[in-house]
Amino acid sequence: MFSGISIWQLLILLAIVVLLFGTKKLRNIGGDLGGAVKGFKSAMKDGEDEQDHKRLADDDQPQNKQDAEQKAEQEKDKA
């Protein structure tokens, strides 16, 4: 992971961070970060869904007059 940094150095660094910020503050920061990531993923999914709906709506639209007439005839035949 980190070249040149041993596991002991990472543990000492973690201990210093915990002493400086405290576990409650770190927990709050972690929760806020997790909420931000969750919100970002949700927004990305909503954007993809919106694009899918727009793409499907565009596919339903006839491209020209002839296509519109053919679609109307097909709907009349079904009825």
Swiss-Prot record:
Record flagged with keyword Ubl conjugation: no
Keyword Transmembrane: yes
Listed Basic and acidic residues bias regions: 44-58, 66-79
Main location: membrane
An annotated GO cellular component: TAT protein transport complex
Membrane protein topology class: Single-pass membrane protein
Family per similarity comment: Belongs to the TatA/E family.
Protein name: Sec-independent protein translocase protein TatA
Gene: tatA
